[in-house]
Amino acid sequence: NFYQKTKNIIKLFSKMLEHKNVNFFGNINVGSDVSIEFISENYDAVVIASGAENDKKLNISGETKNGIYGSGQFVGWYNGNPIHSNLSPNFNCKNIVIIGNGNVALDCARVIAKTKEEFYQSDIMEYALSALNQSSVENIYII
């Protein structure tokens, strides 16, 4: 059963990474290999998905700039957590970066990449659905 669950996760990751607008960059340490300043200057939005129950601070310069959100904030926003309901991610852009490559990072990418049709019968919050349906995002980069 554990093997089957692992196999299903691998299939999910593979399908996600096959999306034409999703790019994966592995073996990169944000803060030493590339700076958050470089990322935020070259991409329109950044989600930090560092695999923690609470958003993990990377302790790197620039991580608190506008338009940079922890994955917990972002997931909380589209799932209706009142603490994050006032978040206003900018999807009126071409490029988004997600820092992290775990399940939550891929969930964030999956939600951002969905089409209007794919949100049919979704339980996503109406305000998030409205923002995502107006998205002009063309590329999602996962680092």
Q: What kind of region is each of these model predictions?
A:
Residues 1-7, 48-61:
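Ferredoxin-type iron-sulfur electron-transfer modules and their immediate structural context
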Residues 20, 42, 63-64:
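Short, structured coil segments at secondary-structure junctions
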Residues 25-40, 52-55, 60:
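A conserved short coil-to-beta-strand element within the FAD-binding core of flavoproteins
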